[in-house]
Every structure is written in structure tokens, then in C-alpha cells.
Amino acid sequence: MKDIKWNGSTISVEPTKKPKKLTGTHFPTIVGVNPFSSPFEVWCRCTRTYEIPFEGNKYTNAGQIIEPKVFDFLRYSMGFGDRVITPEDVYGKDHFKKTWGDFYPNTPIFGGMWDALIVGDDRKIECVVEIKTVQVDGRSGSLEERWKDGEAPHYQALQASLYAYLLGVDKVLMVAVVLKDKKGDYEHPEQVIPSYANENVYTDEFKATVYRRRTPGEWLFKCF
């Protein structure tokens, strides 16, 4: 944590030599569409003033265990086969340590990590895949409130759209795996099988440059 100087109702810090990049997680926050974070929190992180320590829990653990299952869902249930590219395919094992959590080293301001890619027959990238786990019996609202009509929440869609934009593609596929805490999905994520038959998967496909913002009256929102 850096030294902070209080100036009445504002603060100032010594500029950092190397600010942290804005990731897809933080991008929706700075444009005001993430209800779970604030622009000030992102500012503190990027200036290296302060960052909330990451602590793994049953929710993050479940996501890590289920993610490879979603890769198989993409390959077999959705029929993409060997067109599915994972971070391990590109960077090998321990890809986070190898890349420092940034798959866009040549981009000065924005960065982050995509979950998976879909390539065409020519092996060129066609689509960015963003994977989410959705709790339906928690405090953060029902599945219907967050994935209305099967569409991803705006802040999550914007996160995935940034990664697509940085890769120069316009197609995004969001995959949400529905988990029930009361059912024990978070305690035993290894038993969760994402499939349409199990009715525990939502998918939303859209273009990164123009998509519908979920507000009363619904209007088209240009991201970039």
C-alpha cells in the first residue's frame, strides 16, 4: 500500500512508474455499469495505491474445476471440436505465471485473460468465449434477474467484448454454468456436468461492437 496524502475530501499519491492495466473485469466498472465495484476501487488498483488481496474460496475453486468441463461442452455439445482453443493450448501449463495474467502484452492500457477462443477452419480467431458460474440461490438475485431471456448481464458482456476487441474479432460467446449452493454444487463441483440436458447451462452469442444494453426501453449501445 502506498503513502496517501489527504487533501480535505480528496487524496493524492506519488505517481507509479508502471500503472497496472485495465482488464475486462475493471472496464465495465470505469464506464459505470458494474454494480459490484466502483471506479475509485479500480483507480486504487491501477495506481498501485491499494488492492484488495485475492483470497480463494469455494466459489473461485468451483470455477477453476468447472472451466475444463465447459471446454468439453464447447467441443462436444456445441460441436466446435478442435476449433476450441484454451489458454493452455497457447501458453502451456501455468499460463498465469508465464504471462503475469496478461494475454495482451503489446497493448499499453488494456489487458487481461480470455477464457477460450473459437477458431475457423483456417485457424484464425473467430470468437472469444467468456465463462461464468451463476449462483441461483444466493443473495445476488435470481438467475432470471441476471440472465433475462438468456442474455448475459451488461457488465459481463462488456468484459468479454473488450477481450474480443483487443483481438480484432467481433464475435463473443458467453457460457454460464448454473450452480446451486443448497444442492452442494460448490462443495462438490467435480460432480457438476454442464449440459443442456441437465438444464444448467445458459449461452449468449453477440457482437462485441454493438449489443443491447439491458435498461428499461432497451437501446443499442456502442462499446467502442
Feature-to-residue mapping (PLM):
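Conserved catalytic cores of phosphodiester-cleaving nucleases, focusing on short active-site segments
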Residues: 74, 114-145, 163
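Short amphipathic alpha-helical face segments that pack within enzyme cores
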Residues: 69, 158-162
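Secondary-structure boundary elements
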Residues: 76-81, 118-125, 164-173, 181
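Active-site metal-binding core of divalent-cation-utilizing nuclease and nuclease-like domains
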Residues: 86-128
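A structural signal for short, well-ordered beta-strand segments and their strand-loop junctions
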Residues: 32, 84-86, 127-130, 171-176
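Short, glycine/acidic-rich beta->alpha junctions
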Residues: 108-111, 152-158
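Metal-dependent nuclease catalytic regions and adjoining charged, substrate-binding loops involved
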Residues: 141-143, 148-153, 166-224
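Charged, glycine-rich intrinsically disordered N-terminal tails and low-complexity linkers that flank
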Residues: 1-73, 77
